[in-house]
């Protein structure tokens, strides 16, 4: 599969950003490619994306398990790497303010629930510690990806909701944070957690802050 992007694109910065936050068992980031596990609609596997600077394309390889949900993978990857961005429009808007850093993109996420978990785990700790904590949660609650040795699926809401708060606390987080993770997972199961951007962003952010363990800095 091939996706397109408009130059300039600072892939070194993007891979650096993702690499600093890479979760062991989920993501592998090198100078040349980004690879991770993904589960969707009962399917699971891994994918790898490799940018081609000369042709302004992103080459995507899916493991067999993800082929049935290829279209969903493409849409999520476009969002993760902000491929719909028009850098010229941004440059025209920012002018001199952005002239020194052309090609920056806004890193997205493959999954709103996963990003919610990672946001809660990232509270009041360094980027490196947030990645370590997430890796520990994945090791505790994630299941191996079939036919992809070394990779785990990000814990499902059901798996995280069923986790023992004290077992999560033992990974290196306050028990309140563990309870926040479980509450988030349960709200996804209940259908009360917004998995898509709300029509009113400000109202949506205020609503999220009413949830346990989520504040304005989350």
Language-model features, listed with the residues they occupy:
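HhH-family (HhH-GPD) DNA N-glycosylase catalytic core used in base-excision repair
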Residues: 1-218
């Amino acid at each position: 599969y091939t996706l397109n992007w408009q130059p300039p694109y600072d892939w070194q910065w993007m891979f650096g950003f993702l690499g600093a936050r890479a979760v062991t068992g989920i993501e592998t980031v090198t100078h040349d490619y980004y690879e991770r596990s993904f589960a969707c609609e009962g399917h699971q596997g891994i994918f790898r994306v490799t940018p081609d600077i000369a042709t302004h394309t992103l080459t995507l390889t899916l493991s067999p398990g993800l082929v049935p949900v290829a279209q969903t993978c493409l849409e999520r990857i476009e969002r993760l790497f902000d491929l719909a961005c028009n850098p010229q429009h941004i440059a025209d808007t920012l002018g001199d303010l952005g002239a020194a850093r052309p090609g920056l993109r806004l890193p997205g996420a493959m999954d709103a629930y996963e990003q919610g978990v990672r946001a809660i785990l990232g509270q009041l700790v360094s980027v490196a510690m947030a990645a370590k904590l997430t890796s520990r949660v994945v090791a505790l609650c994630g299941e191996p990806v079939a036919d992809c040795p070394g990779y785990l699926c990000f814990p499902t809401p059901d798996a995280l909701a069923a986790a023992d708060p004290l077992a999560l606390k033992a990974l290196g987080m306050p028990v309140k944070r563990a309870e926040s993770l479980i509450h988030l997972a349960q709200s996804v199961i209940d259908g009360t957690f917004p998995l898509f951007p709300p029509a009113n962003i400000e109202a949506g952010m205020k609503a999220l802050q009413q949830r346990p363990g989520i504040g304005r800095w989350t």
